[in-house]
From Swiss-Prot:
This is Hypoxanthine/guanine phosphoribosyltransferase. The keyword Glycosyltransferase applies. GO terms for cellular component: cytoplasm. The gene is hpt. PANTHER family: HYPOXANTHINE/GUANINE PHOSPHORIBOSYLTRANSFERASE, XANTHINE PHOSPHORIBOSYLTRANSFERASE. Pathway: Purine metabolism; IMP biosynthesis via salvage pathway; IMP from hypoxanthine: step 1/1. It comes from Methanohalobium evestigatum (strain ATCC BAA-1072 / DSM 3721 / NBRC 107634 / OCM 161 / Z-7303).
Length: 190
C-alpha cells in the first residue's frame, strides 16, 4: 500500500534550518523529479478511498498542483488552485495564512457558494494554512466534503479535525536528524 510514496519518503534527505528539520521529497518539493508512477499511485489511492462526490478539487500552489491535477484527470472532477498571487478578479477571496515558518496571503478564485469541495494538499505540519483556507471557503458558502493530505507531520491534522472537517492523511511521518521515519500508512501502523 503506497509503496512508491513510502520509499520516496524513506530516502528523503533532511536539512536543518533554524532548529527545524525539513525533508526534501518529490511530492512536497518537486526535488528530485516527480515520477509519474508516484502521482498515479497517490491519485489511485485517493479515488479508491474517498467519496469523490464533489463539485471541485481545491489545492494550494505550489506542490498541491501536481497531486490535484493527477486526481482531477483520474476522477474527472474540475480543479481550482488557490494562488499566492492576487489577480483582482470579481469574487476573489484573500486569505491571510501563517505557518510555523512563514506568513503571507493566498487568493481564492473560481469557487461558488454551494460548491462541494475536496481539498488536497501535499503536506500538513502546523495546519495553519489549511485552517485559514477552510475558514475562507466556508465563509464563501462552500461545503468542505473532505480534506486529504498526502504527508502528515506534526499536530496540524488534529487542529483541522477540531474544525469538524473530515481529514485523511495518506502517510504519517516523523522527521529528525536521522531522517524520515514512517509512523503510519493510511491507518495502518508501521
Amino acid at each position: 500500500m503506497l509503496d512508491t510514496l513510502q520509499k520516496s519518503l524513506e530516502i528523503s534527505p533532511v536539512i536543518k534550518k533554524n532548529n527545524y528539520y525539513y525533508f526534501i521529497n518529490p511530492i512536497t518539493d518537486g526535488i528530485p523529479s516527480v515520477e509519474p508512477e508516484l502521482l498515479q499511485e497517490i491519485a489511485n489511492h485517493i479515488v479508491e478511498n474517498t467519496k469523490m462526490n464533489v463539485d471541485k478539487i481545491v489545492s494550494i500552489e505550489a506542490m498541491g498542483i501536481p497531486i490535484a491535477t493527477s486526481l482531477s484527470l483520474k476522477s474527472g472532477v474540475p480543479l481550482s488552485i488557490i494562488r499566492k498571487r492576487k489577480y483582482g478578479l470579481n469574487g476573489e477571496i484573500a486569505v491571510s495564512q501563517s505557518t510555523g515558518y512563514s506568513k503571507g496571503q493566498l487568493y481564492i478564485n473560481g469557487i461558488e457558494s454551494g460548491d462541494r469541495i475536496l481539498i488536497v494538499d501535499d503536506v500538513v505540519s502546523t495546519g495553519g494554512t489549511l485552517q485559514s483556507v477552510i475558514k475562507a471557503l466556508i465563509d464563501a458558502g462552500s461545503i468542505i466534503d473532505e480534506v486529504v493530505v498526502i504527508v502528515e507531520r506534526g499536530e496540524g491534522v488534529s487542529k483541522l479535525k477540531e474544525m469538524n472537517i473530515p481529514v485523511k492523511s495518506l502517510i504519517k511521518i516523523n522527521v529528525d536528524e536521522k531522517g524520515v521515519s514512517i509512523r503510519e500508512v493510511n491507518g495502518g501502523k508501521q
